[in-house]
Every structure is written in structure tokens, then in C-alpha cells.
Design a protein with these regions (language model features):
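Conserved phosphate- and dinucleotide-binding cores of soluble alpha/beta proteins
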Residues: 53-54, 59-214
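N-terminal active-site beta-alpha-beta segment that forms phosphate/nucleotide-binding
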Residues: 1-85
Length: 214
């Protein structure tokens, strides 16, 4: 399944982007540690690296740092050139033309194509849209919930404050500071350039194309 997701996504980007080396940004972890094979979003990146010279910018994915701790390790194991990007720097890197495409995994997709993924994904999609570069979300068809009309119906988990107040046992802020720590955010379908599952590619992303890949 993940191999097909990877090949479909890589073929699309290879065909649509200008020839030559590429820089792709990703967020959180969507590789073998989160799925089977080489993963979903990272599976697309790995397959694309077999077609083009590729450099990957992996966002940290605070506060649990899945990008820094997991994705960077997987990219190294795959032999893909990469660098770690500060989360807050990512939109600016996109705006200044240092990124050719953004590729992420996904946690849930509504019937209209709204995508829930690791918090911070929405900001990357906004930046990609403003810069006119592809934002691709990749995942299994089982993550598509046709019973959900739109992303506003997706429940967003609010995680514990201590994940933000401290890191690796070191306090980062004033003890007891109130914290907002949503685990996910929702990217509207209008910002998703393409949605990839093992059943195909939804593009443009709308109710009909999403149903076809669910």
C-alpha cells in the first residue's frame, strides 16, 4: 500500500515540477516508523529521490519533535540529503523560494477534502499556496472518512501542558503557565494541491475526487 502511495505521489510531482534538483519540505513523521514500508508522505519523498536529486527540509514538529527525532533519522537511513528546519522558519523558507513542494502525511480526511494532520501543517499549506508551490498530503484510503462533511467536524485533541512547559526534563517556562497544545490542525481542501492514497490521486481536491480515492 505505502509503496503505491509513494510511487503515485512521486510520479505526479516529477511530472508537474520543472526539471532538475528539488527541495521538498515535510512535517512531523510519515515514514516507516509511522506506517508500513517507507511510509506515506515520506514514501512519496523516498520515491521522488529515486527520480531526481533531492534535498529535504524536515520541520522539527514541536513539541514532541517527531521531525527532529524520527524523520531526520529515517532520511539518514534512506541516504537522502536533508536538513532540520525550525518550525517557525518554515513559512519564510517557502516564501523566499527555497522550497519546491511540501509533502506531508495525513491523519484524517473529510468528505470535502479537508485534511487533519500534525499541528503546523495548516501554516505550511498557507505558505505553499501563497508561493504557488504544491502542497501534497499522502495517506491510506482508510484515513478518508466520507461520513464527515468537512474538517470542522474533526475533533482535535488538546494534549497535556507539560509537553510544552518542559523538554527532556528541563523546564522551559514559568511553572504553571497555561498552555494551548492542540495535537492537530485542519487544512482546508482549497489549499491541498493533491491528495494521494493507494487508490489514486485526488486533484483537484473536492468531494468527487476524494470519494474516488477513499
Amino acid at each position: 500500500m505505502c509503496e503505491r502511495i509513494g510511487e503515485l505521489g512521486a510520479a505526479l510531482l516529477d511530472a508537474e515540477l520543472a526539471p532538475g534538483p528539488l527541495t521538498v519540505m515535510t512535517h512531523c513523521n510519515s515514514g516507516a516508523l509511522a506506517a508500513s514500508g517507507r511510509g506515506t508522505g515520506l514514501g512519496v519523498i523516498a520515491a521522488l529521490a529515486e527520480r531526481r536529486p533531492l534535498h529535504v527540509l524536515a520541520c522539527e514538529a514541536r513539541p514532541l519533535l517527531q521531525g527532529a527525532r524520527l524523520t531526520v533519522w529515517e532520511l539518514g537511513r534512506l541516504g537522502i540529503e536533508h536538513a532540520l528546519a525550525v518550525d517557525a522558519a518554515a513559512p519564510g523558507l517557502i516564501r523566499t523560494g527555497q522550497v519546491d513542494a511540501v509533502v506531508t502525511g495525513l491523519d484524517r480526511v473529510a468528505a470535502n477534502g479537508d485534511v487533519a494532520n500534525k499541528v503546523g501543517t495548516y501554516g505550511l499549506a498557507l505558505a505553499a499556496g501563497a508561493a504557488g508551490i504544491p502542497f501534497v498530503a499522502a495517506g491510506p484510503s482508510s484515513s478518508v472518512d466520507l461520513g464527515l462533511a468537512g474538517g470542522d467536524a474533526i475533533e482535535i485533541e488538546e494534549r497535556g501542558a507539560d509537553e510544552v512547559r518542559a523538554a527532556l526534563g528541563t523546564l522551559l517556562t514559568v511553572p504553571g503557565t497555561p498552555v494551548r497544545n492542540p495535537a492537530f490542525d485542519v487544512t482546508p481542501a482549497a489549499l491541498v494541491w493533491a491528495l494521494v492514497t493507494e487508490r489514486g490521486v485526488a486533484r483537484p481536491v473536492d468531494a468527487a475526487s476524494v470519494a474516488a480515492v477513499a
